């Protein structure tokens, strides 16, 4: 009897100690799996979702959107014939008759090489034009690598070389560096050197600067340097561009309102001459009618317009140009026919 009671007491004591040990169980040590912490994984995913910066283009293209839709007027009668002699060579014949400038015949030639860098780009490109006075303008554009492009321009007057310019554009992943050297005179110690840099800060914002250095005996003080700041903000079909320097500033605004309408506003201010000009321009495209119209109005009350109409099914294009200056009470009209 005593043994039975003793064994029963021992069993109850064992169960009590079991419940106590279960209530005082120590926490298990965390096991390291060797993986990346979840916070770091989320941060890496958020970084991967950020849009990659792209090349912002060159500083020369900063205000091109607004400039391209402005009316490029001409005066008098003009006939232009474009003829392709091969897949790489094309010639242009132009006859211009007007009272404002030299009338006569112009000849142009274009050669496009076989080095393909894109569906619409091939290099080298050779351009040449001879005006009615016998002056020659020649340009060479070549893509040396996928990122480096060089341009060379020269001008001949009276069988003499009067102007040269060499430009190199290096397009990085998110920046563009441009170096330009104009009219270098190694014997006369004169010339112009320009350095331009444009950097994509965000997907919409690009900032940069331009440094221009001009030296020579005809320059006041024999040398002058100018530093300017540039910026561009683009979102959707809207682009704001600005150039700010000690001589003035240049501000432009461009918006593509629809597939048929583009609008641009431009303000140029020269602080030294205390002059400022504002221009409002627009372009209307009517693809079904094969018609394009560009018009502009500036603060000097100069109204300009150019109408271009393709005459289908013939390879002809008709251009009508008009320019009216209210301050000078003058009107200029031009009519042109382009074949080819």
From Swiss-Prot:
Q: Provide the transmembrane region boundaries.
A: none
Keyword Membrane among record annotations: yes
Keywords attached to this entry: Ion transport, Membrane, Mitochondrion, Mitochondrion outer membrane, Porin, Protein transport, Transmembrane, Transmembrane beta strand, Transport
One GO term (biological process): monoatomic ion transport
Region Disordered: start-end pairs: 1-37
Q: Name one GO cellular component term.
A: pore complex
Report, as the record phrases it, the tissue specificity of this protein.
Answer: Only expressed in the male germline, detected in primary spermatocytes as well as post-meiotic stages. Not detected in stem cells and spermatogonia near the tip of the testis.
Which residue positions does the secretion signal occupy? Answer: none
GO molecular function annotations of the record: porin activity; protein transmembrane transporter activity
Instruction: Name the family the entry cites.
Output: Belongs to the Tom40 family.
What's the protein here called?
Answer: Mitochondrial import receptor subunit TOM40 homolog 2
